[in-house]
């Protein structure tokens, strides 16, 4: 197949787990003999081509007020104007139309549409090509992509989001195939009225950078026990909640926090923490970090579409405490490879921390099941097999519309 992959960013510009998955998918499918090309946004005007790890990549200058990944945060009015233009960006539709006319792919795989907007769907449909849309976040219902505002998860779509997304559900009906990276992610959009006539699939992300590791022959607890968080230091990740609950328990343990964030917010977190027991270790490689801790904690108070960090922690034979928000519970099963906590019951996080601190046999039992419980998720080849099946079915059923979900994932 001749495939075009559309995403907001592409390596070496990495915004999060979505870019890692796109790169793994593109390079993997190219290795299987498919002709692949990537089109992403970039900071420079015009369309510029390059090879990245042997993959042909086009970077198109973003036709909006600014490129959001330059490291500067504009004021609120400028950000609002950016999102208003991103509701339907005709300039980027024209860029995509030109690329499609020149390259004529068999099929276009859309990932994150921020910058491109849903105008990309019209450009692809006008060119007569089928669309596969992969859902990594809540961009189609929330301009920020996370449905999180003023420190809280948005149970309902707020007025400004509804205004900026008022035609998106209707437009999504013209997408041939939609893939959610978790059952939660797919259901959240379908239940909101999206993709009414699309073929629907769930394909879990893989963990492409996790080497095979044998389980430790014997788990020797450190004293003090080490809990660890790794990820973006942003309000939706629940780090404030974690610090509060950890210190409330007064455990014989330490808490390591790895990651980066805006300086003011990181300083706020540090002001809450007792430096004798809570240690901020900066940006760390996840493999090295997981080797230093006994229990991983993913206490998100905003929804996680998938939760790659939880998958990686399990792959390192660690028990994992996760919040019940989003797709995390599809990776970590309560009492099997970790424990659940709920932001609706704040003390549930502290209870989970205490249980694993005081019950070494529970901790070891969860750790012993951790990697096996996610083994099928880890495989890049599994993910590629499932996407190949979806792409082939989409081409074969071009013009057909199905409203029923088809679970391609082997999990």
Q: Model-found features: residue ranges?
A:
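A conserved mid-protein helix/loop that constitutes part of the nucleotide-sugar donor-binding site
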Residues: 20, 225, 229-248, 347
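Membrane-proximal helix-turn-helix segments that form the acceptor-binding/catalytic region
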Residues: 139, 155-178, 187-188, 192
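Carbohydrate-associated surface elements
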Residues: 184, 206
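Glycosyltransferase donor-sugar binding loop
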Residues: 230, 254-267
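Nucleotide-activated donor-binding/catalytic signature segment of Leloir-type glycosyltransferases, i.e.
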Residues: 266-284
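Conserved acidic donor-binding segment of nucleotide-sugar-dependent glycosyltransferases
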Residues: 283, 334-335, 339-347, 355-361
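Short hydrophobic beta-strand element within catalytic cores of glycosyltransferases
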Residues: 319-322
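A short, well-ordered alpha-helix in the C-terminal region of glycosyltransferases
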Residues: 348, 355, 362-389
